[in-house]
Amino acid sequence: MNLRPLWRGSSLRLLLTGLLVGAGFDPAGAAACNVKDFGATGKKGDDARPAIQKAIEACAASGGGTVEVPPGEYTSGTLHLRSRVGLNIQAGATLFASPDPKAYDFGKIPSKAALFFGEDVEDVSIGGQGTVDGQAEYEWRLDDHERGFDHKTLMETLGKSLMRSFPKDFPKRDIFPHLVWLGRAKNVRVSGLRFLHSPSWTMALYACERVNFEGLYIYTSLREAVWADGIDLDGCKDVRIANCTIETGDDCIIFISADTWGPALVCENVTVTNCRLSSASAGVKFSEGNKVGIRKILVTNTVLTNVNRGFILSTTLGGYINDVVLSDLTIDCNRFDWFWSGDGQPFTFRITRLSEFNHEAPQPGEAPPGSIRNVQIRTVVARAKGSSSLHGHAESWLDGISFENVKLRLSADPAAPYDKAEHALEARWAKNVKFRNVEVSWDKPEIKQWKSALCFEDITGLQLDGFAGRGAWPERDTPAVLLKEVSGAVVRHSRALDVVSLQVEDAFSQRGGHYSRAAFLAEASVSRGAVRA
């Protein structure tokens, strides 16, 4: 489903003018450069790159303006953006990314290859009602590239086929361009357009500031498009993503703090609102490649449908994730083919060392575990196929995680070759955890390994207030809530929908054969027989 573009012809020009005025530019002298006046034919088979680049340079030489791309089909390699120049790709115009790797400029870093390339530019925009098509191609063959990981090992154990999608000609070909790459750009607006079939991350930004993505439709194949993310923000700040529909094979939106294109920088001050996301990987990912930190992120009023994973907050290189709010969401998870990460779970929090993430022995000099602190999740309705997990690290516990007004429903996936789900949600190595008005339910038929609605292990300072739910198998004495090695817990205003509501294992301090009330408190509002030790 495509959102209606919010920019229309004259509105685009007004917005571009406003952008340039904000940069101190005099609109009376703004140039308007039509690419056909510079030699573009509008025929797909012709190379439009020289003409479009000439139009960009002419606008820049005039002090800024708008490059008009009228209806037609245009094929191009790398286009270098210039400060105070906007592109208006009109309705009926399609700009194709050249399939020739030699058509892309990237200096010494192949991962900078892109159709639109801008480095150290300001006051730029890419907008309109047209289409940008990356023409990505894929091929299916037996997996002979990835090292063994959980899903692959399971498939091998089950004797299942390891056929999977690869970018065409990988690894002989090493240039897979983005549709947009921006580095250290400021005052950027990308709006209204359809971005389709990117061979790599659709939008890749490094160290950019004051960026606005508005009313975009981004699509890559949910079956095949490995690596083809939607929007990747690396060390960026003051970014707004609004009113966008993003359907991608790989992750829809990524936050990261890496050193691929320069020093690792904090990614911060980002809002995502009024969007619709679908992905064979993750809807929103706080990437494990985080070396410094990701903070002050708000995702709200967003629908995640047909996603393998809803939200993943992961750190493996020592970086931190702080001050995150995820609110007013609907999440509908499904499993995808075995080579996609995920098991149909709405939430995954994970702190590991890199060696642990790679299932390897500890490495000399590797970064210590990072941290995840102060994350609020509220007003969510989620359907899941797999277990949500909130896992800190024995050396770095999650801190200040809260769930409020959350409904979670787990359902079976009979077609899946494997199903690893156990508890609906499990948390381990965490402190100061709050669950308020959380409800968990299960669809029939229940899977034999399903267990408790909530499982808490190695937790200090747990508040469970207003929980409603049951274990998957009450006839097996499966508790609704399982506590293991939990201290400082308070349960109030909670009710179980079966006989066995809450089971405690090693949750109290034992004194003389009796459990100390200091470690666990179940208030009178908890239903009779709720605590079983």
Regions found by a protein language model. Give the residues of each.
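N-terminal secretory signal peptides that target proteins for export/translocation
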Residues: 1-8
